[in-house]
Design a protein with these regions (language model features):
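Active-site bordering "gate/hinge" segments
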Residues: 1-203
Length: 203
């Protein structure tokens, strides 16, 4: 589970949203790197640290998730919540050993700390190896999103809850109390591994 904290931007740039599958002029992975504040050189450096104890395989996983909720009770909105999860994790495999570590930030110091922690957990004693990175295309989204949740305001969500509230009361005059809620979550993920692949995904 990645930590919750303030991050540079609440919304993912449109260039990242549209780049999935190579549809944008700027690649999805390159756009995601900009968003997470990392470069290809940074990723290679962190990957090298993850493999410095002789790991057979390593991957880096960056995640930026937005969670929102609205609760309506007694015909009124009585609770609204929002949470942002942001951070990165490093996994290293060495034989039957698995090392994993995560941090709630993406400074070079934090990423290297996670990489070296994972490397120590899964250590084979062999020499480390260098890694190149090549963008891989994930199958184009099967369920196109016409409007990202992060672009939908709380004000725009309330009418749906009010309509649901009214509908439930209209179904049976024995209904005395209704609580309705609407929650949404959007995740942006940057993933790269020691086999040379790098990917961006939106969930």
């Amino acid at each position: 589970m990645l930590g919750s904290l303030a991050v540079p931007s609440l919304a993912m740039p449109a260039s990242v949203r549209g780049a999935l599958g190579g549809a944008d002029n700027q690649s999805a992975v390159a756009s995601a790197m900009v968003h997470f504040g990392v470069t290809e050189a940074d990723l290679k450096k962190v990957m090298a640290a993850a493999l410095e104890k002789g790991g057979d395989y390593a991957d880096l996983y960056f995640e930026h998730t937005f969670n929102n909720s609205v609760v309506l009770m007694d015909g009124k909105v009585n609770n609204c919540g929002a949470n942002i999860d942001f951070g990165m994790g490093v996994r290293v495999l060495a034989g039957d050993q698995t090392g994993y570590a995560y941090v709630e930030g993406v400074t070079m110091e934090e990423m290297l700390r996670a990489a070296r922690t994972a490397a120590r957990i899964a250590s084979s004693g062999k020499a480390g190896k260098s890694v190149g990175l090549t963008e891989k295309t994930i199958t184009k989204s099967r369920y196109a999103v016409t409007e990202p949740w992060e672009d939908v305001s709380v004000k725009a969500k309330i009418p749906y809850l009010e309509k649901l509230n009214e509908k439930i009361f209209s179904l049976d005059n024995r209904v005395r109390k209704v609580q309705a809620s609407l929650s949404d979550s959007t995740s942006h993920v940057l993933f790269c591994n020691s086999e040379g692949g790098s990917y961006y995904d939106s969930r």
